[in-house]
Amino acid sequence: MKIGVIGSGSFGTALGSLLADKGYEVTLWCRNDSQVESINRNHINNKHLPNFTLPEKLTASKDLRNVVQGKDMIVSSPPSHALSEVLREIKEYLPEKVPIVSASKGIENGTLRLVSEIFESELPEKYHSYLSYLSGPSFAKEIIQKVPTIVSIASKNETTARKVQEIFSFLYFRTYWTPDVIGVEVGGSLKNVIALAAGVSDGLGFGQNTRAALITRGLNEITKIGLKLGADPMTFLGPSGMGDLILTCCGEQSRNRTVGFRLGKGETLEQILSSMNEVAEGVKTTQSAYELSQKLGIEMAITNEVYKMLYEGKNPREVVKDLMKRDLKREGVSV
């Protein structure tokens, strides 16, 4: 089996490494020559994962046509804000009747489209039943280190979901399939917003009680907006919901938690983002999530406060204080 991976960031590279480790021939699309040369000559992604050796069956190319055309499966892993442009570039080369797996997470700024909505609007209908979405608690470095990991595979088409599940599942990588595309996407996107808040709490020196409170109430917000969009509430108790939320809020490898932590320590957002080599999806997703909650008429207190901190300059300590001063409520999810 020949597989093309679009996106040479840490997660796209990790998925490519997993698939190559299973024995598949994997070609990774990179935008710069030094990265291509480093992967092909030294089996190292010098830009994103310089300390890890990649399998020999993973090669790289700058030629998008070469990466996509004639492949038996396509894995798409660009940042969500770049997804529309990438899909427009690849669709003339995209093979028909092969699985297309998205690992992008986020909600598009301006349009407020989920990743699945971007795929379905940018690609012709003949591709739609072959689309699937991968999400779950999975740091890239730990996948490459072969640490046992579980994720969700969501597709509206059961045949596609089961095929992708079989292709990805391996000794250290277990997948669970679900038809709930919306639930998997909402969980994978909004957990990054909550992780920003958890990072701020840690940066300010608050304890684990506070982090647990943010995770708990964050799951409430994720579930509320998911239900409004038609998701199955049980999805949010699975790998792409609670699993990913816990990892992203607690793990030191989490880029979004790191951004929040540094904000809590007093750095500006501009300083933080300019120093990062990878995209922290939560920053852009916060804006979209805030606008979506306003559009749907859903109260999302944590999301609103993170938005004010990122885009209106609100002091991080005031964010936590105002969350604690909110009107008292009954426990539960109400939409």
Curated annotation (Swiss-Prot):
UniProt keyword Ribosomal protein, yes or no: no
Described purpose of this protein according to its UniProt entry: Catalyzes the reduction of the glycolytic intermediate dihydroxyacetone phosphate (DHAP) to sn-glycerol 3-phosphate (G3P), the key precursor for phospholipid synthesis.
Bilayer-spanning residue ranges: none
Reactions this protein catalyses: sn-glycerol 3-phosphate + NAD(+) = dihydroxyacetone phosphate + NADH + H(+); sn-glycerol 3-phosphate + NADP(+) = dihydroxyacetone phosphate + NADPH + H(+)
Active site per database record: 191
Protein name: Glycerol-3-phosphate dehydrogenase [NAD(P)+]
Matching Gene3D superfamilies: N-(1-d-carboxylethyl)-l-norvaline Dehydrogenase, domain 2, NAD(P)-binding Rossmann-like Domain
Key words of the record: Cytoplasm, Lipid biosynthesis, Lipid metabolism, NAD, NADP, Nucleotide-binding, Oxidoreductase, Phospholipid biosynthesis, Phospholipid metabolism
A Pfam family annotated for this UniProt entry: NAD_Gly3P_dh_N
Binding site for sn-glycerol 3-phosphate: 105, 136, 138, 191, 244, 254-256
Organism: Leptospira interrogans serogroup Icterohaemorrhagiae serovar copenhageni (strain Fiocruz L1-130)
